[in-house]
Amino acid sequence: GASGPYASRPAYDNVGQAASGWLSMFHAGADPKVAGPAVSDAVAGLYAALGVLGALVERAQTGRGRKVEVSMLEAMIAMACEPLAAMMATGQAPSLYGRAAMSQSYVVTCRDQRRIGLHLSSPEKFWRGLVAAIERPDLLAAYPTRAERVERYPALAATLAEVFAGQDRDYWEPRLERHDVPFMPERRLDELADDPQVQHQGVFYEQVHPRHGALRAAHRPVRYDGDNRSDFRPPPDLGEHTAEVLREAGLSAQDLDILQQAGVV
């Protein structure tokens, strides 16, 4: 934040995760490791964008501008709304796998060492669909209610792990789909471009940089009237747009010549 006891301290992604409680929910055991993308950086940026948009809407209505501020700490706390609400209701900090148990989410490794993500949520039909897909009707009697599946999550997870380890992923996928189980095979980032849904939605595109050739990037995730195309210029080289920015700031051609001769730009 702009003030307070931490205001003068440097902050990066992992600092934001540690300060906001996120880091405690993503590691366990005696050998904790940092994993995943820079969540704090992305979340703070998203909330900043929302704040700017809100200020622009207000300005259009009132003619008054706003100073928009976002701290990484507050942004990450806001994004943790679900576990935070649970903690406030129960007085207990969520365990590492608390959300997985409540949402009935599982990651299972198949015989070929490829993984599947399952999320059964609340509807009973998804649990029954999973039981039918893996041909284990005995589990209906062993775990008759959702409350029992939540309470005995570790035991159920171990059973599912044993079942899925018996066949390759290609065996399980059509069975899960046929029984309408919420699942997806675990994708690596380098596999995304080959995913049929990703291809259908036209997620990735290529642009040509004048010096560095073809570059691949992802379109924006928002569609306007069905269109998600991004009209972005290629990433600039160091200093490529400095003169353009300075001209927009009001510097004259003569001012730019002086700066260029002095080696400033």
Regions found by a protein language model. Name each.
Residues 1-115, 120:
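Active-site-adjacent "lid/gating" segments in soluble enzymes
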Residues 178-230:
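A glycine-rich dinucleotide-binding beta-alpha-beta segment and adjacent secondary-structure elements
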Residues 17, 34, 43-47, 121-125, ...:
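Conserved active-site and cofactor/substrate-binding residues in soluble primary-metabolism enzymes
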Residues 136, 198, 251-252, 264:
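Helix N-cap/coil-helix junction residues
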Residues 104-179, 183:
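Aromatic-enriched alpha-helical interface/lid elements that frame and gate functional surfaces
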Residues 141-152, 157, 187-194, 255-265:
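Short linear loop/turn motifs
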Residues 211-258:
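Flexible, small-/acidic-enriched active-site or ligand-binding loops
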